[in-house]
Swiss-Prot record:
Coiled-coil portions: none
Gene3D superfamilies: 2.30.30.30
Gene (UniProt): rplX
Oligomer status and interactors: Part of the 50S ribosomal subunit.
Originating organism: Synechococcus sp. (strain RCC307)
Domain of life: Bacteria
Functional note: One of two assembly initiator proteins, it binds directly to the 5'-end of the 23S rRNA, where it nucleates assembly of the 50S subunit. One of the proteins that surrounds the polypeptide exit tunnel on the outside of the subunit.
GO CC terms, sorted: ribonucleoprotein complex; ribosome
Name this polypeptide is given: Large ribosomal subunit protein uL24
Family named by the database record: Belongs to the universal ribosomal protein uL24 family.
Keywords from the named record: Ribonucleoprotein, Ribosomal protein, RNA-binding, rRNA-binding
InterPro entries: KOW, Rib_uL2_dom2, Ribosomal_uL24, Ribosomal_uL24_CS, Ribosomal_uL24_KOW, Translation_prot_SH3-like_sf
One MF annotation (Gene Ontology) recorded for this entry: rRNA binding
Amino acid sequence: MATASPTRTKMRIRKGDTVQVIAGKDKGKTGEVLRTLPWENRVVVQGVNLRTRHVKPAQEGESGRIVTEEASLHASNVMVYSTDKKVASRVEIVVDKDGNKKRKLKKTGELLD
């Protein structure tokens, strides 16, 4: 049985954006996007969806440790957050006079890049 090959999703959320979680156990939290995973349609957000991992000692004499790190969230569970207006909004793509594409928040009209 053949499995479906993963497809790259065009994401409107980028690294460095401030986002708010809109679903799940961390609903309402905000943070900066550290990494996007377009092949999985997921994002890693700073301080959100934390997981603890036990790391074995790499060398003899070194002790093992417990590491807390961010796990990825599905991109549909986050919205871009305006820090000025304190509101989460969807993103639309607008084309300016020169033909360049820009991202704009639908609720506030704020340009992202």
